[in-house]
Amino acid sequence: MNLMLQNLNNIRTLRAMAREFSIDVLEEMLEKFRVVTKERREEEELQQRQLAEKQEKINAFLELMKADGINPEELFAMDSAMPRSAKKRQPRPAKYRFTDFNGEEKTWTGQGRTPKPIAQALAAGKSLDDFLI
């Protein structure tokens, strides 16, 4: 709870702060607190109603499943029994060719970190187009 809310929650602090305001201002603040409290109650009631409706729907589906002879655990068993097809992404084709520091010719797709030999050549003024395959 932040400091302002702690002050509002402490009766002695409220009394001390109230001395600085007129009764009209205090009544206006009180009305605003009532409005905020009412809105908050309505929000919580709405959430409770939505949760109750959701639970009723779940119970209705469970009853329908029991009436048809379907056990809820069977649904989960079916889901785990089916193998998931993980899509294997094809590797990207090489886009650039360069010679590394050991004299070996290597390729780079253009994805990820720029290899050091290419980065040094770019810093020296070469263009990336010079390395295109």
UniProtKB/Swiss-Prot annotation:
Residues 85-95 have a biased composition (Basic residues). The keyword 4Fe-4S does not apply. Residues 111-116 bind DNA. GO terms for molecular function: bent DNA binding; DNA-binding transcription repressor activity; minor groove of adenine-thymine-rich DNA binding; protein dimerization activity; structural constituent of chromatin; transcription cis-regulatory region binding. InterPro entries: H-NS-like_N, H-NS_C_dom, H-NS_C_dom_sf, Histone_HNS, Histone_HNS_N. Keywords: Cytoplasm, DNA-binding. Residues 81-115 are annotated as: Disordered. GO terms for cellular component: cytosol; nucleoid; protein-DNA complex. The keyword Nucleotidyltransferase does not apply. It is found in: Cytoplasm, Nucleoid. Forms homodimers, can interact with H-NS. A DNA-binding protein that acts in a fashion similar to H-NS, repressing gene transcription. A subset of H-NS/StpA-regulated genes require auxillary proteins for repression; these auxillary proteins (Hha and other similar proteins) may also modulate oligomerization of the H-NS/StpA complex. This is DNA-binding protein StpA.
